[in-house]
């Protein structure tokens, strides 16, 4: 019983101490998505869908929820963001070739159609895409892909 008491106190102290150690935040501003939006020309509705459902994990600007102030949850969130940006980062759009941009949009379509994006862990507190928003997003992504496919054909000539 004595060891359980000491262990509990140690655990509580550890929890308190880690509250003062925070990971770096992903807050570099929405200007980092401007090239992506300039090239893909989303409507205002699609831009809002992207901002509300995609940019938190797939851009250099994250709108953090209140629970990000609690360690170790904030470390878990940062890992999700790093992983999301590793797979699809609209803030790095200018570094992608036309082929890669087409492929990234193809993956976006695939993951949204299969219900894999947005992640369930994200939608628990942020809400999910409505069926209409999903269809609108998919149509926009397909149209955007056509532009990149045209660019690839031009380069092949």
Language model features by range: what are they?
Residues 50-61, 117, 137:
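The canonical Cys-X-X-Cys-His
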Residues 114-116, 123-152:
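C-terminal capping alpha-helices of c-type cytochrome domains
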Residues 1-39, 143-157:
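Post-cleavage N-terminal segment of exported redox proteins
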Residues 66-72:
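Short cysteine/histidine-rich zinc-coordinating motifs and their immediately flanking basic loops
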Residues 42-55, 77:
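Sequence/structural segment immediately N-terminal to covalent heme-attachment motifs in c-type
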Residues 40, 44, 48, 99, ...:
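Soluble non-cytosolic domains of exported or imported proteins
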Residues 75-123:
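Extracytoplasmic electron-transfer domains, predominantly the class I c-type cytochrome c fold
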């Amino acid at each position: 019983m004595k060891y359980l008491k000491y262990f509990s106190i140690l655990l509580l102290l550890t929890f308190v101490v880690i509250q003062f150690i925070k990971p770096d935040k992903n807050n570099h501003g929405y200007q980092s998505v401007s090239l992506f939006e300039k090239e893909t020309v989303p409507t205002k509705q699609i831009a809002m869908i992207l901002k509300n459902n995609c940019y938190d994990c797939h851009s250099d600007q994250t709108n953090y929820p209140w629970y990000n102030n609690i360690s170790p949850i904030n470390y878990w969130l940062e890992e999700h963001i790093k992983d999301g940006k590793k797979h699809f980062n609209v803030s790095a759009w200018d570094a992608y070739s036309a082929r890669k941009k087409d492929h990234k949009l193809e993956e976006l379509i695939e993951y949204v159609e299969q219900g894999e994006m947005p992640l369930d862990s994200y939608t628990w507190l942020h809400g999910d895409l409505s069926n209409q928003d999903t269809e609108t997003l998919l149509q926009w992504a397909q149209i955007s892909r056509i532009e990149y496919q045209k660019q690839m054909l031009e380069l092949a000539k």
